[in-house]
Amino acid sequence: THHHEDHAGGVRAYLAEGATLVTTAGNRAYFERIASARRTIAPDDLSAKPRRPVFEMVSKRRTFSDGERTVDLVDVGPSPHANEILVAYLPQERLVFQADLFGIGWGTPIPAANTTSVHFAKRLQELGLQVDRIAAVHGRTTTRAELEESLGKQVAATQ
């Protein structure tokens, strides 16, 4: 999704296996540094078999399909959280998978939206993404109605 370490921590294991890293151009230098970092105290698989990362860049949107199911990687940045940040959108399922843009914990009340969530909702609208469910890296899967409720609480708090 983006370059923060809690979302990119395992990338070296994938690179060691020869996986192609799909990201945005602005994140390339970060991932090149991660790939070239020396691990001498606790060598990992990439240290044992070093290789240069292979990149596939996403500029705005990249669609993957197997003929039955489609996944769109969409850059919803720049956002208050990261300049370039990808979401995975499954149009058939009306589902978006995102990291750090909107989240509600398990058994917690719906919070007032923060600036990042407000931006996320705006980008969903601008991009025409038809979303019913929002899967989160941190927190539970939520609904569009819960996002709207969160936005309503943010507006009410500012009045």
Residue ranges and their predicted role:
Residues 25, 145-159:
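Binuclear metal-ion centers of metallo-dependent hydrolases, dominated by the metallo-beta-lactamase
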